[in-house]
Each structure stands twice: as C-alpha cells, then as structure tokens.
Amino acid sequence: MNGRDLALALVSPGDAPRGHRDLACASLKALEEHLIDAVSEHSADGLIGAAVCGAGPEIDGAIALTAGDFTLTQAWLRAVLKTPRVSLLNDFAACALGAPRLAPSAMRLIHEGKPGRNAQIAVIGPNLGLGVAALTPHRTDGWTPVVSEGGHIDFTPGEPREVPVFEALQARHGRVSAEHFLSQQGLADIYAALGGGLDDSDEVILARVRDGDETAREALSIFSALLGAFAGDAALSFAARGGVYINSPLMERIDGLLDQAAFSRRFEDKGRMSAYLKDIPVYLAVGRCTLLGLSALFTASDLRYEAAEVKVLDC
C-alpha cells in the first residue's frame, strides 16, 4: 500500500503469491472495502494471517503513508481482517526479503562481482521515492531485513556535469536529498535542469532516449551515475558483500537504457574503498519483490520476519 494504489495477492505457506491484482486505493475507506471483499472472496481458503507493507517508516505498529493522507495500524488491520496474525512492515523491508527469492532469469548483472558467502545484501529502489533496505543472514537459513530511511540522506555532486543539476534542485528544495535525484520526479528534474521540458514524465524522457535525443540521453546518463554513486554508498553502509539489488517499476522501464559505464564508474569511485567495491555484484531485479517478500513471512508459524526462509520462486 503506497497511499494511492494497493497490490493484493493470496499465498499458501512456502509458495509464490497468486491471484495478484492492482487496485486504486487512495483512502482508508477504500482500503477497508478492498480488504473486506478479498476476505469474503477467499473465505473458503481459511485465512490464517496477513502480511501488509506500506510506503513509510513503521513505528510502533503504525505506518503514516508518505504518498497518502492516512495511517495504517496493526490494530486496525486485525479488526478489518478479523485475524490476530498481522505483520506490518515498511515496503522496502518487504522488497528486500523478496529480492533473493526471484528466479535467476529475473536478474540482470549490471556490475560484475562475486558475492561473498553469508554476507549482507543491500536493496535499493528509485521510484515515487527512494527505497533502501538490507538483509543480514539469519542464524538459520533465512534473512533478517534491516530497515532504512537512507533515501533521505544528503546528496552532493561528484562530477562537474552534475553541479548545474544540483544547483537547480537546491534552488527549488533548499536541502537536497538522494531521493530528489533518484526517483521518477528526480529523472524529470534532471532533464529539466539540462534544458528539457519542465513537466515531462519519465516515460516521455525514456522514449526520447530511445529516439536518440541528446538532452534525454545526458539526463539518463547523469541519473545512472548518481544511482551508481548511491548504490556504492549503500554497499559501504551495509557492508553488502553479498551484492546490491535494484528493484522498482522505474528501473524496469529503464532497464537496457541504463548507462552501465557511468553507473560502474561512480559505484567504484570511493577513494581508498574502491577495491572493496570492485568485487561487489549489482543486479537489476525484475519482478514483484514486495509481494514475494511478504509471502516469505508465511513460512514462519508466528509470521515474524526474522524467521523468513528464502526460497527461489518464479513469479
């Protein structure tokens, strides 16, 4: 749930989610109606619990949705769903849990490297905002998610061509965070700062990249470089020797258009830590990581995410 849209799916413990549907959902009332309908539709299946994630930090069993004007709480969800077994977590914690469960065919290597054994993983996703999380190996065979609000850290230019873009965003926002660059709006703002259209969407900009538009191509190259720099920072912050996964609808639209040379150059450009980053692989993960991550919670009898067991699933 991101405050605008809702993704729903049914899952049996240990299996991939099924019956996935996307629904418009911009209010608590609409969410309640969708959940009641879903419970009614699947009443014969025997609901044993629910795993719910929202776009925003989870604090004491509540998430104030960053793209909405209402708050999700565990207590409210339990009452609506009529089950005490409800897990509520940040959407990128769920995305992180899902990333290593994707089938190998859903992974595209965008920075060469060799993942370390029993090493932590970082997961990032520029979309409406900039999601950041990590996974640390569990004491058994699973993963424990590490939640982060790292998308809101300060961000500064690292190359001369990025300075005018930074100054344009600083003039608009004052303090500039990573999310101001690495998001749907961020790509549009980079393009506008280079002289492109002021209100063009990422879809329009990417179409122009495909058509060979030089301004659009430069905007995407800068975006790619900044993404590489941020991915490198995430790898350092989480000691992510197991790799960095990038997953979001925006990145799926970019995919083969990414400037991998610019990405890798900035990913490794970390001074004396460059050698540390050189061997860390980075993957573009294509798929519904969030739903896969939520389904992982149903492998544990108590639905704690510490007990999530990783299993590769085609989805």
UniProtKB/Swiss-Prot annotation:
InterPro entries attached to this UniProt entry: ATPase_NBD, Bacterial_glucokinase, Glucokinase
GO annotations of cellular component type: cytosol
Molecular function GO labels: ATP binding; D-glucose binding; glucokinase activity
Leader sequence segment: none
Keywords, alphabetical: Kinase, Transferase
Pfam families named in the record: Glucokinase (PF02685)
GO annotation terms (biological process): glycolytic process
Family named by the database record: Belongs to the bacterial glucokinase family.
Record's protein name: Glucokinase-like protein CC_3167
Phylogenetic classification of the source organism: Bacteria, Pseudomonadati, Pseudomonadota, Alphaproteobacteria, Caulobacterales
